């Protein structure tokens, strides 16, 4: 599902309830262009679903509260719905009017990278028009006018009962938060603030309280502290008398708590910086708090004391237990990050979340930011092999992988709803880019079938995914969706939860009654269902639970959905027929259970009028709500079912105080409705009365009666006889043009459940499954329902063995879980034998005992042939898995000579630690090669054809790890080398690591240059690995910058003589540390340059040793068979004690000997 998203990243995250605190927020246009001025908010308490760019959408859990105002680029809005209500307003220059309603039921489907924000669901228009065309005098069609079909407008101005109150002294304040708890309470709280956009902080605040439904207000700054700056207002969703105020964390981190609806407060210090709150859905004093440093705290005393639950919690991935699904009401579900950056799913008790008491319901890691707990379901995502896999737990049972059609191959998925024990999901398949397919699940949320293809999606300003899908309030199973067909977007409607869809029939006439010529399927009505990038421009739809037949939306008539020529439409028969009500966008407020509709026009000008309709939009009357035109910033309806009081927030000018206009609609009603004031209305779909398997008859108030009604729901409901229309195709089946559900090409209907054993029974699907929540009875129910059938005996077939994570690798010394899968066969009476390939084998008597997998630990690395054999009385099957067992590669050391001869083969070896890590790939770079040499062996041989310094690099790939080492080698036609030794005290300070050897080599070279005066370019020193400490000294034929010929062999001999002399005279030494002198001297003659090796002997070193031995033997044989016998000469008088030189004595001649060659005395350099 990409991931389970945490709310709504678009700026339009509005809902009537914010955080269960009853907070509805408004920001004026242009005030906040980024999250810098308005930090992101968190999911609201309204159970709405939103989608994120990477994943599972997240329904804002009940009671989640934002810490700061959310960014909204919009105009003011209506806000009303059952329950508590509050409004957040923000004012800027050039205020515009917009009205929006937020309803719990009118849920739009959205997603975002940010927490879910309050969203208008009940009539919030989203575009701006300047004027209402008088009475709608511009028609949509031509022909004979039918006055009976025209929308009537009464232009006579009527007056509503209203009072105005100014929040004196707050003219500079540009934000306001309003809470109206309702439930027979007359208390309204308003928090106004001055937000400095340059500083990015709140600099002033005021708290106001009304006890007479908003007629008058009292300023409470002295009760909370005159110098206290308040930043946010929270209200307990289960007890509206409990209020919580958050101080500005820039100054202090404190909570002010009230238990008397904000009359008095007590201050409590916080030892953390609060970012969001989550109230418990039942216990009024239980709260979860998320801090800015990603720690989760709990309080059982309504914020008076806090206890740390868990650190490193993923933002918005914490939930209270769901009643009925969890036994413990104080259980907390959360997603936490491990030290190495992985995410895990944890549960624990709010006051006892110790390491020992934490549970891990999902084994292993989950994808980051992917946990969602919603109703009876828990969802997580796990990506393996480059593909996302989605898992669900129903009523906290073990997780099962969610099954889509085999070749859906989703690249993104979002859970839209989990209502009525069923999962509704939007899936973007491998071949889709800007559309999603809608899928609906069985009760357990495991098996999904297609409901609608190619539903339009778009990206919000924060990258959030928005799906054009709307669930109509008050009628179960009714949805509207915008589907993309041949690059045209059309609106479809369903009454049976996606089983059947059809286009919307356009109105027969326009506002004036002129006929509209629109023929299906070429022309239809199209509605805006999504929030646009500017969340309060065109695109609004509204419905109410208490008015199930009435839907108000903006849209257009034509061949496709358009962003131009937008009008307002209403349906009073649940979407069967529609009527145009305005030619410009208005926002709609439902009064008196939907018996009265209030419309307020979008305009940038101040207004003082609104429109009322008592007959479901057929006619409208003009009412004034204030004597002075007002720039409207927002409208808040009275909480509760009746909604007869409305407060309009605005200002007379850009510099004036906030003006609060209380509008009382009670005066427009004559009386309470009696039984004779109602008429019956039957829900239907194009004349079909059976909707979701039942006939439902509602009562509606007669249009000519102006009485206050009471909502009673459906007058009566009776089940229908089941027909084929009450059944959808089962998993693995597809509906064909004749209406039949037939198996998909990839599905084998004869496949049995793996739990099915000979003598048992299984449910044999007929290809159909009843639509969840459908109430039909009898009829074809028996014919289409899966029937129990005896399990036939079958030989094993389709055996597979895989690792639990789908990988072909395992780590040495760690558990690897192997899963045995069998398509067919009697799993209860099948013998399974598993050979791990390392000399260990196990047997099982049935497959059921292996459901959790077979765990095994490999002690050695290598490629192991894992075989599994299954047998029953009817046959057998086998499968093989080649498993690569590795261990982590920790270090790579490149071993090769320091100096080599031109055109001579050089051996390079990659020495590994540990030496056995499994299957490896070696990548070699050397010389001037532009392409590497790739081998499976750790050694290579090569030659250099030119002199100079060359770099060799080896990269070793082991699984996901790649390590490398680089060395430099000098190439010359000839050079001299000598082994060096040191005074024994150096060994005490030798840690035997490459860095130390490089530093000591540099010090020795410096000492040699200082003692001999030989240019440093002629000397190369390499300290060798191991103890005792030794080094190799190389004399190189350096060529200076004047491009003179390089040194001759005789010159190298002269340099060698000087070096040997100084070494023999003990003139080369260095100070390792204060008081520690190290003497450098020659060790012995070497026949070839040595190689920098690890303590283990390499092949090249052994070859050198053998070469020395063979040379020694050859010299011995030659001299043994000489005609003249060589007699030893007495020791040279010039030899010094400790002289490590080795003399090769010549046979004594009969004649006087010739002069010795240069350099014959002292140690000899190897050539």
UniProtKB/Swiss-Prot annotation:
Its main location: membrane. SUPFAM superfamilies: Oligoxyloglucan reducing end-specific cellobiohydrolase, PKD domain. Glycans are attached at residues 184, 352, 433, 775, 815, 846, 907, 928. The keyword Cell division does not apply. Residues 802-893 form the PKD domain. Belongs to the VPS10-related sortilin family. SORCS subfamily. This is VPS10 domain-containing receptor SorCS1. It comes from Mus musculus (Mouse). The gene is Sorcs1.
